[in-house]
C-alpha cells in the first residue's frame, strides 16, 4: 500500500522460537503496551521514535485483527503486508478488508513528521542541481 510519506524501515513480524532466542542473548525487539501484541509479534526498526508513532494503540489493534502469521513492513513510501495464502477465500477477503483500513488507522503524526514523496523528489533535484560542475 502506497502512502504519501517516506518511512524508515520497520518490520512487525510474528514472534518465533528463533527471535525469542535472540532476545535471550540481548538482541531485543521493541515492546509496547499490549502484552498480547508483544507476545505474538516482534517489532524491529532503525528509528525507535518512528516505531512508537507507527505502532500506536489503533495500529496495534489493527495488526492483531489481521491475524497470526502476518508481517507488516515499511519501505520508503510503502506499507507492505505479507501472509500465507493458505486458507479459504473468505479469510483472504477479510484480510484485504482490514489492510484497506490501515491508512485510516495510521497515526497522523507519521504523515506530519516524515517527508512526503514530493519533498523527497525535491531534495533529490536540489542535490543534483548543486552537484553540477561550476554551478552551471
Language model features with spans:
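Charged, low-complexity intrinsically disordered regions
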Residues: 1-136
Amino acid at each position: 500500500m502506497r502512502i504519501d510519506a517516506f518511512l524508515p524501515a520497520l518490520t512487525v513480524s510474528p514472534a518465533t522460537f528463533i527471535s525469542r532466542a535472540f532476545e535471550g542473548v540481548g538482541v531485543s525487539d521493541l515492546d509496547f503496551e499490549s502484552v498480547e501484541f508483544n507476545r505474538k509479534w516482534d517489532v524491529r526498526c532503525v528509528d525507535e521514535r518512528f516505531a512508537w508513532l507507527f505502532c500506536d494503540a489503533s495500529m496495534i489493534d489493527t495488526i492483531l485483527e489481521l491475524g497470526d502469521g502476518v508481517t507488516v513492513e515499511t519501505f520508503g513510501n510503502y506499507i507492505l503486508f505479507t501472509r500465507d495464502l493458505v486458507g479459504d477465500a473468505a479469510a483472504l477477503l477479510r484480510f484485504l478488508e482490514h489492510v484497506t483500513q490501515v491508512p485510516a488507522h495510521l497515526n497522523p503524526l507519521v504523515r506530519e513528521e516524515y517527508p512526503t514523496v514530493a519533498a523527497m523528489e525535491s531534495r533529490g533535484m536540489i542535490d543534483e542541481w548543486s552537484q553540477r560542475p561550476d554551478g552551471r
